[in-house]
Amino acid sequence: MFFSVYVLEEAGVHQFVFLSSMSVYGVDQGPLDPMTTPEPKSNYGKSKLQAEEGITALRDESFAVAVLRPPMVYGPGCKGNYRSLQKIAKIAPVFPDYENIRSMISMENLADFVKQTLDTRADGLFCPQDPEYVCTCRMIRDIAGENGKNLPLLKVLNPAVVLAKKFTGMGRKAFSDLYYTKSQGNEGQNGEA
């Protein structure tokens, strides 16, 4: 680590912004905030937390470290979970009308948050998110609509969602409430962006 700090100082770097993930918390439901204890379950979440720990060890009075833990990122060209939702929206003839709340962030809003973090030389842990929560079924319906498809939402399918949430990780991931609290959504432990 000493070599890394020395190289950064010699290059005139005074801040590091690390894009981590909500995955460090290791949960698939519930409200979260920057004070929630990380307990990653996946290799992805574990690797993000290890990187956070290594990078924050570089923090000192002349070197700011901002760790951003965004929720699912959506927008053109996004991969991962958002791409899975796009595929479902394209092929599903109907979808459950099941209410849930999720934190998400658009690529544009995340880019703006990163810029603001750099512009203010913010230091700390941040959980950026869009101003409004998202409901999975409404999002899938909207994605279908963007592709010229009318996707009916049916409450009669909701018992299947309850079973899927109880017995499958995919069901919990898609339909559980998983969100950052609004009071803590964009605030850091060591500062604000």
Regions found by a protein language model. Give the residues of each.
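Conserved active-site helix of classical SDR/Rossmann-fold NAD(P)-dependent CH-OH oxidoreductases
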Residues: 2, 45, 49-56, 112
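Conserved Rossmann-fold NAD(P)-dependent oxidoreductase catalytic core, especially the SDR/UDP-sugar
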Residues: 3-43, 58, 63-66
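Structural signature of the Rossmann-like NAD(P)-dependent dehydrogenase/reductase core
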Residues: 17-18, 66-72, 103, 127
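Short-chain dehydrogenase/reductase
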Residues: 41-52, 72-75, 79, 103-105, ...
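Conserved beta-loop-beta element that borders a ligand/cofactor-binding pocket
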Residues: 53-76
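A conserved pocket-lining segment of Rossmann-fold NAD(P)-dependent short-chain dehydrogenase/reductase
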Residues: 87-105, 109, 127
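Short linear elements at protein peripheries
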Residues: 104, 109, 172-193
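Mid/C-terminal beta-alpha module of Rossmann-like enzyme folds, strongest
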Residues: 113-173
